[in-house]
């Protein structure tokens, strides 16, 4: 989203690019369009709307959402837009002490899901960028502890039980495909991607999926009252 925010993409250019993408991939079965790009939806609203409406008109067979900045959610800006098929929030990579936003949800990603679930019109929601496995807490300070499989499991179950339609798993090494010979990786990467894919968090996501699909998917209703002492 930085190119758009920097004023390097006009509304007309955005439409042309979205039309090209839609034409190229409209017959592919595994496409979900992520409008935005790790950015506040309040930045260059007209461009994001142009892209969203173009996808809706030119490729109605694929879902469209918006990838927001850390500790924000797409519903703040686009929930009522017809091009937004489902909401996405980014709980981000900060721990409780590092979150300096007004909401101060910190690691409580379930709060974003709970908020979206109660909106009208009803739309699905999920955490599109929670803390990734094996990435430093807060991203940039490599002296901080690294998020592990216990953390990603916690985020996954918390958000799904609060009403999310699914979950996004990420791994620091795999995200950047870090490999031998790369001069310098990002975010304190310590593993190669082909080792990272075998870390425990990735393999454990299947258990949540199995649980979600063990009952009729569209009949799931979150009930936070079942949780005693917030899981402590």
Per-region residue spans from a language model:
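Active-site clefts of carbohydrate-active enzymes
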Residues: 75, 84-103, 107-150
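Structural recognition of the beta-strand scaffold that forms the well-ordered cores
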Residues: 31-35, 63-66, 85-89, 124-132, ...
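Residue-level preference for long, well-ordered alpha-helices that form the structural scaffold
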Residues: 6, 10, 14, 44, ...
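A structural motif corresponding to the C-terminal end of an alpha-helix
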Residues: 24-29, 57-59, 115-123, 162-164
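Short amphipathic alpha-helical segments and helix-helix/interface helices
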Residues: 22, 52, 113-117, 156
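Active-site mouth of glycoside hydrolases
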Residues: 1-98, 108
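Short Asp/Glu-rich motifs
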Residues: 3, 76, 137, 178-179
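Aromatic- and carboxylate-lined catalytic core of secreted/periplasmic carbohydrate-active enzymes
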Residues: 121-125, 133-136, 152-232
């Amino acid at each position: 989203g930085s190119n758009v925010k920097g004023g390097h993409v006009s509304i007309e250019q955005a439409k042309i690019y979205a039309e090209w993408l839609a034409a190229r991939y409209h017959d592919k079965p595994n496409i979900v369009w992520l409008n935005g790009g790790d950015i506040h939806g309040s930045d260059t609203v007209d461009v994001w709307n142009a892209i969203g409406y173009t996808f809706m008109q030119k490729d109605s067979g694929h879902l469209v959402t918006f990838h927001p900045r850390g500790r924000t959610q797409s519903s703040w800006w686009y929930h009522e837009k017809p091009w937004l098929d489902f909401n996405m929030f980014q709980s981000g990579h900060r721990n409780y002490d590092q979150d300096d936003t007004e909401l101060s949800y910190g690691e409580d990603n379930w709060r974003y899901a709970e908020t979206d679930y109660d909106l009208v019109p009803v739309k699905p929601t999920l955490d599109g960028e929670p803390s990734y496995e094996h990435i430093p807490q807060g991203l940039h300070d490599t002296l901080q502890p690294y998020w592990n499989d216990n953390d990603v499991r916690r985020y996954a179950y918390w958000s799904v039980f609060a009403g999310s339609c699914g979950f996004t798993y990420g791994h620091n090494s795999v995200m950047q495909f870090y490999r031998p010979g790369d001069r310098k990786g990002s975010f304190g990467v310590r593993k190669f991607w082909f080792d990272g894919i075998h870390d425990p968090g990735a393999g454990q996501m299947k258990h949540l999926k199995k649980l979600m699909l063990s009952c009729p998917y569209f009949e799931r209703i979150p009930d936070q009252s079942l949780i005693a002492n917030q899981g402590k």
